[in-house]
Amino acid sequence: MRWNILLATAALAAWVAVAEDDFGEHRKLAYNRNDLVCDAGWGLWAVPLPMDYDGDGDLDLLVSSAGMPSPGLAWFENDGSGILRPARIIDRRQRRNVTVSYVANHVIVCEPGIAYRDFQQNGFSRPEPIPLPPPEHYDRDCQYRFADVDGDGRTDVIIGYSDWREYGWDDAYDPSGRWTGGPLHGYVGWARNEGTNEKPRYAPFQQFQTSKGPVDVYGTPSPNMVDWDRDGDTDLLCGSFLDSLTWFENIGPDPAAPVFAPGRPVEVDGQPLRLELEMLQVVAVDWDRDGDTDLVIGQEDGRVVLVENAGHDAGTLPRLKPPVFFRQRADKVKCGALATPDIVDWDGDGDMDLVSGNTAGFLEWIENLGGNPPRWETPVRLTAGGTVIRFQAGPNLSIQGPAEAKWGYTIPTVADWDGDGLPDILCNTIVGKIVWFRNMGTRQHPELAPAEPVHVAWPDEPPRPHWNWWNPEPGDLVVEWRTKLAVIDLNKDGLMDLVAVDHEGFLAWYERLGPEQRYALAPGRRIFHVADPETMGVRDGGGRPLSIDINGDGVNDLQQRSPSGDPLFLCSDRGRDRTVVRDARTIYLPENPVPFLSPPASEQSLLRANGGWAGRSGRRTLVMTDWDRDGRLDLIMNGVNVNLWRGTGEDGRQVFRDEGPMSDLVLSGHSTCPAVGDLDGDGVDELLIGAEDGFLYWFPPGTLKPETVKP
């Protein structure tokens, strides 16, 4: 087998080299060190496919990612050292719902309705149809696997699938913060093989049942058939969209009609196993070849954990060890998923480091060790008041519902906020409430105090996004979620101001007040304009132009006002699966058109970074800097990679023209995050882009489109 793999690898080598360039591999920030080990990670939404890919007798780790900008399948070779080799890309297609099965010591890889029975030899080149359609009403997850469910020696098909219809997606809290949508559902069932293994004939698909109803977990079931309690029959073990695993004991007297006990949590040391992140993809396999079943689990940020089985006796549950992340020889710098870097000399040693957030809600410091190209340390999680910083939405602080409980979406901006000469951190999150961490240490040894709110001198109650069910405390600044702040002395008075996407999606300036107001911020002022309102005025979370004309008057509704004079938002009409517009109180439908109002002339060219409602809101990240050195501030904002918004205003007016993407690479999934600074110490600022795959893409000026470098 090894010879076959070598031949296949050689045949792919030239293609892979081209594919890597196409997907930005050459722009990923590298550790540039041979002595370093880090967590093994690949892309977004890790789906592990453990198998002996190179035929050397041990299991390698293959990881599939369907997320942008690093889709495809990566091979982490296990050379027996306990540390995996760096990822090698062996497929570049965006494959959702890929799985692995182990049948009679044979590896079969599946996609919905497709089997690759000789994957180790031929990869995805020889698909075979599985004559079994997917279940109706599945969303996101539809996972085919093979197993002998009934013990008759014939291989059956099991399918796990998610159903999001009851959950919906966003904006479903009542005024007390209770989610009024339903839960996610993750169902599992099987199609019995009534033919032979050579010529299978599958019975109609049937859901697995427990003594209390259908097998149902919280989305993303990733089902595994395994004798978990070693009592001689096949049990069912599942993952979930959140952070837990569930097993269902087989209690049916008739193997041809399996019935399971209600689900019980998989436990470690007597407590339910909880993973660090969510969107779990579970594979039950004997990773260490010691004769028992271990668990290999992928999570949203592209990393994979091993939950080792320490052994168990017949009729007992496994003694599981705590989860441990697979490790690899360090190659490319990765910071979770949706990396949101900022560039700063954090430790005062003269070179520029990185402070980044991610979906998991951590803040991480990536130290620059110097050199050109720079060498890097692995990310270190920052602490405040002696505790690791982590924001999480919990059951009701994500507008998209409780399925996002373990996400935090931290987006830091590092600046000297209190004027003491030390870099502090301001931070937005999944919640949208702006906080800051005071640096109480020294220039060489930063030490952060616990988070405290940024204070605004509001004359009345603080505004908030209209879809938030909760109200800010007096003085709080609550803006749209998942947006990056700019901290800059905009009016040149010696005090650091704040620029943010406000609670209605407009870019706003929050001026810093003097000592008589205890250096609070003034309420936001919408002073930022676009050079061409018709083409540049309103965007969505990915930076794309956003327009809708629900009343047919030929004008973009999102640049108008409702009859009551309020801004309008793009939103979903769930009942009819369409987009419409609304203000804070009223949804406007095309079958009942009403005239909208034109805003005052001074507001018609305002830069509205996002015109979306609720889950469509926010997600805009930006840097404000004089990129082209013409004496005017420019904006760099997220887009297909990032866009340069060149400052064109005169006499101090803040006017910007969208020059388009700064690179030809497609880096966006939901959004990207820009940072600007001199990482290699050559005296020239470079562009760094954090992407949804968690990798950081580094662009010295010579690698960018010329028209986005010079005016």
How would you label these PLM feature ranges?
Residues 10-12:
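Short, linear, compositionally biased motifs with a strong N-terminal bias
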Residues 15-711:
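Beta-propeller-forming repeat regions
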Residues 2-8:
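Sec-dependent signal peptide recognition
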